[in-house]
Swiss-Prot record:
Gene Ontology annotations for the cellular component aspect, listed alphabetically: cytosol
Cofactor binding: number and manner: Binds 2 Zn(2+) ions per subunit.
Protein encoded by which gene: pyrC
Assembly description: Homodimer.
Disulfide bond sites: none
Binding-site list for substrate: 15-17, 41, 136, 251, 263
Name of the protein in question: Dihydroorotase
Listed cofactors: Zn(2+)
Residues given in the record as Zn(2+) 1 binding sites: 13, 15, 99, 247
Signal sequence coordinates: none
Keywords, in A-Z order: Hydrolase, Metal-binding, Pyrimidine biosynthesis, Zinc
EC top class named in words: hydrolase
């Protein structure tokens, strides 16, 4: 197979940041994706419908003339999120989900949830409104090994949450473990999972062996090879509730290449090429169209994009960096050649 045509894809987990960085990276994502679930972890976080509306307008204002890219907005769940705000979000027409960051789990998560029991009424309202909860599934705390955070979260937080809220739709985002992969490919119709290109392609050796590679560093951190294999099997299985979510997370080069580097891999401009590489390695290229273009809309109750794109087997030279406003952004696989690229008519 030398070409693959699929519905124009959506990204169900995307960071666009704000300010000059957003002005630079939003057009790069819009060139690849039709829609994207936009993460709310700004400073300050997007916690109200009013803030989400303003952020949406800033994103739309950063797009080139004629762009049809649609930002699907989210709210940042806090201990104080009210049921009334959830009702307003569901009625807005542009807020499509609420994001759970456990406090301290990742970039700009300090305002995150400290105890889900404090969010009981908001989560109950989400059940009533059919608004999905998107989860950064890591437990935090000094006693937890960083490589065990996801499995601890599933056992100690996620399962009790699902039991307490039997009608709540949940997306376990950026699944990184075999335990998580098994969970989201189970029989629970409320539960879906997104998979990033880096977690399908790489393990923790790729991050650490032969020198620390800051542009492979993300949260949740890359795991064991056995986990990567389980993720790839799940993502390429054809299961209807697994779909594309890059977690593309731009940081200025200096914030990554430092003594205390930020977590996040920048992949949006090359994401489809990376996913094609992973799916081809699994012998499942024919399943990429559902993963990238159909499963996500089905879970969110949205139409599949009528436009199509075509991947072709031809070298794609990844640039050393992309424009990032005040400072360049270095992508994953910078300076390397990928085997698949989007066909440019």
């Amino acid at each position: 197979m030398d070409t693959l045509t699929l519905p124009r894809p959506d990204d169900w987990h995307l960071h666009l940041r704000d300010g000059a960085l957003m002005q630079a990276v939003a057009p790069q994502a819009a060139a690849v994706f039709s829609r994207a679930i936009i993460m709310p972890n700004l400073q300050p976080p997007v916690t109200t419908v009013e803030q989400a509306a303003a952020y949406r307008q800033r994103i739309l204002g950063a797009l080139p003339a004629g762009s049809t890219f649609e930002p699907l907005m989210t709210l940042y769940l806090t201990d104080k999120t009210s049921p009334e705000e959830i009702v307003r979000a569901a009625a807005s027409g542009f807020v499509h989900a609420v994001k759970l960051y456990p406090a301290g789990a990742t970039t700009h998560s300090d305002a995150g949830v400290t105890d889900l029991l404090l969010c009981y009424d908001a989560l109950a309202a989400m059940e009533e409104q059919g608004l999905p909860l998107l989860i950064h599934g890591e437990r935090t705390g000094p006693e937890l090994d960083i490589f065990e955070r996801e499995t601890a979260f599933i056992d100690d937080v996620l399962q009790p949450l699902l039991d307490r809220h039997p009608r709540l739709k949940v997306v376990l985002e950026h699944v990184t473990t075999a335990v998580g992969a098994e969970l989201v490919t189970g029989d629970d119709p409320r539960l879906a999972g997104t998979f990033t290109p880096q977690h399908l392609l790489y393990n923790r050796n790729d991050l650490l062996v032969g020198g620390l590679k800051p542009h492979y560093y993300c949260m949740p951190i890359l795991k064991r090879e056995a986990d990567r294999e389980a993720l790839l099997e799940a993502a390429t299985s054809g299961h209807p509730r697994v779909f594309l979510g890059t977690d593309s997370a731009p940081h200025p080069r200096g914030a990554k290449e430092s003594a205390c580097g930020c977590a996040g891999c920048y992949t949006a401009p090359i994401a489809l090429s990376l996913y094609a590489e992973a799916f081809e390695a699994a012998g499942a290229l024919e399943r990429l169209a559902d993963f990238a273009g159909r499963n996500g809309p089905a879970f969110y109750g949205l139409p599949v994009n009528p436009e199509t794109v075509t991947l072709e087997r031809a070298p794609l030279e990844v640039p050393a960096s992309y424009p990032g406003g005040d400072e360049p952004v270095v992508p994953l696989r910078a300076g390397e050649s990928l085997a698949w690229r989007l066909h440019q008519p």
